[in-house]
Amino acid sequence: EQMGVQVVTLWLLSTDNLSRDPAELSPLLDIIAHAVDELAETGRWRLRLVGAVDLLPEPLAERLRAAVARSQPPEAKAEGKKGEVVDPEDRPMQVNIAVGYGGRQEIADAVRELLRERAAAGASLEEVAASLSEEDITDHLYTKGQPDPDLVIRTSGEQRLSGFLLWQSVHSEYYFCEVNWPAFRRVDFLRALRDFASRERRLGR
């Protein structure tokens, strides 16, 4: 918030993680639920679930949805009164909680939702294929309505993307950090921002 960041996405659990042994997965799910509850209770940020929530155990999915609901500001504060436009600077920071998230899964879900929407409107498959655009898919992603990430921080020293925000990160800058996520400190974040600020972004040009 102090650095003017408007949107942050925390990837807490991938779709691949869901195939772990139950004895290993259960404690991890408890940790995630507790962490999201704590984020919601602060009242400082708007939370949004990003992922295939239907793949999660139902008790966890319900708990996460409840936490997200608690984090939403009053309508008057979020949208303004009587049509008043609210300055984006006055809105709480958006924190995306990526749980049950996979980049390929997100794109598949976006295309599936788009096809269902067009079919309900009476369009044929041929008509959908003829008119399909990148913007159509973007508008059906989990993060629809949000800007693409400027910076992706990969912790734990791994030199791979693991499918994180595959569609959205086409022009993102990447920063690889040796520190594991639970030990990630403010100073590590500031180093990442400093490194990012020193780069000349070409945005595909």
Where are these regions (language model features)?
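Flexible, compositionally biased loop and terminal segments
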Residues: 1-205
